[in-house]
């Protein structure tokens, strides 16, 4: 029986880039990996209502951590006068015990971001919206926003049924086997009175040619960054 692998992991190094960029020796590797996981969980929990799609972490040799937060609502993350992102930077510094710089990157079209779409469906299911209605709505929005194809699958006790099952819908073309195809994948869970429901989303945005380095996305825009300089003063750019 064939199994589906994560489309992002299959394309890393070809048309996708790593979400974590750093090198470490065997002694420190495990600690840094756990630290990255804690940072991601904290940021995701703190910015739950801000529509965080992806969190990239980079580490430099000078003991500095750079966190790139991809969000659909950058204004909520930055806050009034940049206070929100400054508080976030300080909280991350407490976790990592290192100098931290935070970049806020806007996701221009959240309707075509698979992770945000999956979380949107989960949000609706937790509020007792019909799973079929929720899936079809996000599919229509994605296709109208320029996606070439989308597939959504929901698993669990759908509608409170006794036996769990998987039900999905697709529209357009989603070529999972083509490595040059830009497939955006997202997963989210919905906590309902009948148990957990899992939502998977695949969005096809077109073909891209493999290039060295990160593939530039027309769906993102850097809107601000905050870091701490060597003199301890806050430096902010928008």
UniProtKB/Swiss-Prot annotation:
SUPFAM superfamilies: Prokaryotic type KH domain (KH-domain type II) (SSF54814), Ribosomal protein S3 C-terminal domain (SSF54821). One of its GO terms (cellular component) is cytosolic small ribosomal subunit. Residues 39-108 form the KH type-2 domain. Keywords: Ribonucleoprotein, Ribosomal protein, RNA-binding, rRNA-binding. InterPro entries: KH_dom, KH_dom-like_a/b, KH_dom_type_2, KH_sf_prok-type, Ribosomal_S3_C_sf, Ribosomal_uS3_bac-typ, Ribosomal_uS3_C, Ribosomal_uS3_CS. GO terms for biological process: translation. GO terms for molecular function: mRNA binding; rRNA binding; structural constituent of ribosome. The keyword Transmembrane does not apply. Part of the 30S ribosomal subunit. Forms a tight complex with proteins S10 and S14. Belongs to the universal ribosomal protein uS3 family. Binds the lower part of the 30S subunit head. Binds mRNA in the 70S ribosome, positioning it for translation. PANTHER family: 30S/40S RIBOSOMAL PROTEIN S3, SMALL RIBOSOMAL SUBUNIT PROTEIN US3C. This is Small ribosomal subunit protein uS3.
């Amino acid at each position: 029986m064939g199994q589906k692998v994560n489309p992002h992991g299959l394309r890393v190094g070809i048309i996708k880039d790593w979400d974590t960029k750093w090198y470490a020796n065997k002694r420190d590797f495990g600690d840094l990996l756990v630290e990255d996981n804690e940072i991601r969980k904290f940021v995701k929990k703190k910015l739950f209502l801000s529509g965080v799609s992806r969190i990239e972490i980079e580490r430099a040799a000078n003991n500095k951590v750079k966190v790139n937060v991809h969000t659909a609502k950058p204004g909520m993350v930055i806050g009034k006068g940049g206070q929100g992102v400054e508080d976030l930077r300080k909280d991350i510094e407490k976790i990592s015990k290192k100098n931290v710089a935070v970049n806020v990157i806007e996701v221009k079209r959240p309707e075509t971001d698979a992770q945000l779409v999956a979380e949107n469906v989960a949000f609706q299911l937790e509020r007792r919206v019909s799973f079929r209605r929720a899936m079809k709505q996000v599919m229509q929005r994605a296709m109208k926003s320029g996606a070439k194809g989308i597939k959504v699958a929901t698993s669990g006790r759908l509608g409170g049924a006794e036996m769990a099952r998987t039900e999905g819908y697709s529209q357009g073309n989603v070529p999972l086997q083509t490595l040059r195809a830009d497939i955006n994948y997202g997963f989210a869970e919905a906590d309902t009175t009948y148990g957990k429901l899992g939502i998977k989303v695949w969005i096809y945005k077109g073909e891209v040619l493999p290039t060295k380095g990160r593939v530039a996305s027309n769906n993102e825009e850097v809107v601000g960054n905050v870091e701490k300089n060597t003199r301890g003063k806050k430096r902010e750019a928008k």
